Amino acid sequence: TTLLEMGIRDIAIIATEKTVDIYRKLLGEGSRFGAALTYLTQPEPGGVAQAFLIERHFIGEDHVCLLLGDNIFINTHLDLISSVAAATEGAYILAVRHGKPEQYGVVSFTRGGRILSLEEKPQKPRSRYIVPGLYFYDASVVGAAEKLPVSARGELEITDVNQRYWQDEKLHVFRLGRGTRWFDAGSPEDLFKAARYVRNRQKQTGKLIGCPEEAAYRKGWIGWRELEWSAGQNRHSLYGKYLIRLMEYA
């Protein structure tokens, strides 16, 4: 849904050999979301930056957005950021304040807002701004990833990719404001926090968070017929009932 809301419709999903068919069965080829989905496999864990090597042919000469599957963004106005990034040479990363920056990639700034440092999970962070799992790059990211050395953790680090763009003075950063909610749902505790927030927010607003059919419908990529089909497929669930209500007000 996050990608669709940014206007991105050509999407590659990278998963393990054991799970890729689960995603394919769940999401299909993407037409019911007004998108085209491609499925790629990661043979073994090799770091976030390995994604660019796996999808090098998918990227081709295009700009690319990389979104980590356990990152949840709410109220971020990412469509505006995506539009700017797509027209910009180099790379765009986000920055958000966090209480435990040592667990993430950390970015620090000068008083003028220029990037001062980029570090991967530092023991003594220079700032409380961390880099969440949503990145925008031009097509040269594939070449940058190909030249990366394997880190001490045995991985191709995304922070090293960003370092290369920064050294070439082609790295841009957008600090997310206080109205933004971001969750890293990579642990049971963090997943619980995210689920609790989403539940409360949905009860308050009456709107689902993470409904790709709704995002596609509001973009004009699918019509009433596709919405009706998805509602029928999920008619016995709360999700299906939500789509039916959406159709009634469409």
Where do the PLM segments sit?
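Hydrophobic packing residues within well-ordered alpha-helices of enzyme cores
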Residues: 23-27, 145, 194, 243
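Conserved N-terminal catalytic core of the sugar/cofactor nucleotidyltransferase
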Residues: 1-68, 72-79, 187, 229, ...
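Catalytic-core segments of class I nucleotidyltransferases/pyrophosphorylases
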Residues: 65, 85, 114-214, 218, ...
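Short, amphipathic C-terminal "tail helix"
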Residues: 221-222, 227-250
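Residue-level signal for inorganic ion chemistry
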Residues: 55, 70, 107, 113, ...
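Conserved donor-nucleotide/metal-binding helix-loop-beta segment in metal-dependent transferases, i.e.
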Residues: 75-103
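Short coil/turn connectors at secondary-structure junctions
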Residues: 8-10, 34-36, 60-64, 87-91, ...
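A short acidic, often aromatic-flanked loop/helix-cap motif at beta-alpha or helix-coil junctions
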Residues: 45-48, 100-102, 124, 181-182
